[in-house]
Amino acid sequence: MVPFFVQIKCQLGKSYEVANKLADAEIASEIYSTAGDFDLLAKFYVGSSIDIGHFVADKVQTIPGIADTRTIITFKAFAS
């Protein structure tokens, strides 16, 4: 499995709604609210044959209330 993170900027007043919809979709392993330019941080795992860009475009960015995303692809985990 390949891990990656997505920072999510929500429409005003929609962060809890987006977080709940993301949790209900059961596609993220972890979802956090954050301070700063983005409202949420979600961790995902996909199989090595899955295109991360298509996954984010099809499964994450289509959730109502999301205004913008930033995908962070990781290389090596030093601790878990």
Residue ranges of model-derived segments:
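A compositional/biophysical signature of low hydrophobicity enriched in polar/charged and small residues
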Residues: 1-80
